[in-house]
Amino acid sequence: MAARVAAVRAAAWLLLGAATGLTRGPAAAFTAARSDAGIRAMCSEIILRQEVLKDGFHRDLLIKVKFGESIEDLHTCRLLIKQDIPAGLYVDPYELASLRERNITEAVMVSENFDIEAPNYLSKESEVLIYARRDSQCIDCFQAFLPVHCRYHRPHSEDGEASIVVNNPDLLMFCDQEFPILKCWAHSEVAAPCALENEDICQWNKMKYKSVYKNVILQVPVGLTVHTSLVCSVTLLITILCSTLILVAVFKYGHFSL
């Protein structure tokens, strides 16, 4: 009997709580909706512009990010760019280390067992983290710089160029203090190093943005299969000629002791 009474009382408390929630729910939801609507009204888009500089096999990837004019607390924030490098390109980790020492860029490779000498068809995608810097010419802007290099591709039968697609990166932001406009852009949270020379892990906000270009396409010159016989013949001829000249020079000018 006592157990039945306790069950009835528990059910009554649950019904009372549900009724209270139904009574207060619409008002709270309306208040939250008004608050979100106010924040959305003052939202401005994040604009990302990604472009590739230079020609040939050695390029520079330049990423510029512009925030809205209404940002007052942007100086408390850091921007991290997570860039995927396609198999047709590679980033030299030793070059990145040299650029960090000279304070030119702050970037680090995430991928391990990375072979910079491998051709395109034996490579896989890699990942780079770039800590963007404030743009001195724009108050609400960040920019990042990354040198990339084209890998060798298989010869083509017709076209003498190969296309490499560089997709837009992920933008991650970490701020020392919260401010309402972050709700406009924050999509999810991602764990990443707080700084380049820091082993601490921070929870970065993955940001939504609008890109000027859908993606960047690089055209890389490649050989033609119709030239295979010619290239092999000339290479073999030059190799034999050079080897012969070296042997002649060794026997003519070399000093041998028995």
Swiss-Prot record:
Glycans are attached at residue 103. It is a single-pass type I membrane protein. Pathway: Glycolipid biosynthesis; glycosylphosphatidylinositol-anchor biosynthesis. GO terms for cellular component: endoplasmic reticulum membrane. Belongs to the PIGX family. Pfam families: PIG-X. The lineage of its organism: Eukaryota, Metazoa, Chordata, Craniata, Vertebrata. It is found in: Endoplasmic reticulum membrane. InterPro entries: PIG-X/PBN1, PIGX. The chain crosses the membrane at residues 231-251. It comes from Homo sapiens. GO terms for biological process: GPI anchor biosynthetic process. Stabilizing subunit of the glycosylphosphatidylinositol-mannosyltransferase I complex which catalyzes the transfer of the first mannose, via an alpha-1,4 bond from a dolichol-phosphate-mannose (Dol-P-Man) to the glucosaminyl acyl phosphatidylinositol (GlcN-(acyl)PI) intermediate to generate alpha-D-Man-(1->4)-alpha-D-GlcN-(1->6)-(1-radyl,2-acyl-sn-glycero-3-phospho)-2-acyl-inositol and participates in the sixth step of the glycosylphosphatidylinositol-anchor biosynthesis. Probably acts by stabilizing the mannosyltransferase PIGM. The keyword Signal applies. This is GPI alpha-1,4-mannosyltransferase I, stabilizing subunit. Part of the glycosylphosphatidylinositol-mannosyltransferase I complex that is composed of PIGM and PIGX. Interacts with PIGM; PIGX stabilizes PIGM. Residues 22-230 are lumenal. The keyword Transmembrane applies. Residues 1-21 form the signal peptide. Keywords: Endoplasmic reticulum, Glycoprotein, GPI-anchor biosynthesis, Membrane, Signal, Transmembrane, Transmembrane helix. Residues 252-258 are cytoplasmic.
